[in-house]
Amino acid sequence: RGTSKGWRPWPPLMSNVRPHENQRRMSPRSVTLRLMTAHDLPMLHEWINRPHIVQWWGGERPSFQEVQEHYLPWVLGKENVTPYIGLLDGEPFAYAQSYVALGSGDGWWEDETDPGVRGMDVSIAQPELLDKGLGTSLVRALVELLFADPRVTKLQIDPAPHNLRAIRCYEKAGFRQVKQIVTPDGPAVYMLCERPSPVSSRSAA
């Protein structure tokens, strides 16, 4: 998973998911997810160096070579992270990733014993698109996609305590605050989203 939740590796999951599967639409605009490819790396490098991303992702400004070295193994399915590009009306506008929490390494989730737990991170690349409900739609789309895998038991996310925008977004998407924790990146709010209970096949009399 790496030593930072900034541009460095977070810890393949769902490598068989094809672009545009399990898409979720919001009216009147469409928010979808596709797998990230190597062709997205220059765009991702530019995104990661935008001020509002730097603010929340560790303050570092990596070179393209550094971004390529860290993200290309994920794209190629060589590590335990799956990266996605969020699309707004078909155009890239956000980055998202999921990872298997168990065995993340580097001090992350050392007490985790459930192989079905997935972590996730999201970030909107365009600051002008913040506070428009798109983050919530993106998180919901990723939640839906991940829970489509029957192996997944629950989802977790760990925003910084002062990132109130992110915390509100995740709560709207179905996450709940569990506790304050200390991660290798510092203090965080540990949030969980449980798998929805199966709908009973028996109809009410």
What is each stretch, according to the model?
Residues A148-D158:
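Conserved GNAT acetyl-CoA-binding A-motif
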Residues G6-W10, S15-S27, E171-A205:
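Terminal substrate-recognition subdomain of acyl/acetyltransferases
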Residues Q68-L129, L145, R195-P196:
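Acetyl-CoA-dependent GNAT
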Residues G133-L142:
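Conserved acetyl-CoA pyrophosphate-binding loop and the N-cap/start of the following alpha-helix
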